[in-house]
Design a protein with these regions (language model features):
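Phosphate/Mg2+-binding loops and adjacent switch elements
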Residues: 6-123
């Protein structure tokens, strides 16, 4: 998993380890690391291309770029768009009026659309 590490107090590329905390790598990357430990490599980097190059050298098969829908320097094999069911992207507006970082029409770049917060019905 490659994340920018929003609001972290450091810069550059960091491969997460037990010595890191939310201040050095950001809150979401530390959650990923704590959940998956040694099963998944978690990195933070402002430069996603450099991080991908490191992973290519390490022969990583799958790279998940967290919050990278707007990342134009990387050509993804697959784009996944997540949207809250309580505030779906198609009823929202671009920031600062709404919560969207891009125009709604750009949802057409998504290969998959996942709505979070949906009720699950069992029969």
């Amino acid at each position: 998993i490659i994340s920018r590490g929003y609001k972290r107090k450091t810069s550059g590329m960091i491969i997460l380890s037990d010595k890191d905390d939310f201040r050095t790598v950001g809150d979401e990357p530390i959650q990923y690391f704590k959940k998956f430990k040694n099963e998944v490599k978690v990195m933070v980097s402002e430069n996603r291309v450099n991080a991908l190059n490191v992973n290519e050298t390490d022969k990583i098969d799958v790279n998940i770029l967290d919050d990278a829908y707007q990342q134009r320097l990387v050509k993804p094999d697959m784009n996944i768009l997540l949207s809250s069911i309580k505030r779906p992207f198609y009823n929202d507006y671009i920031f600062p009026v709404g919560m969207l970082r891009e125009y709604r029409k750009n949802a057409n770049r998504a290969d998959f659309l996942i709505f979070s917060g949906c009720l699950v019905w069992y029969y």
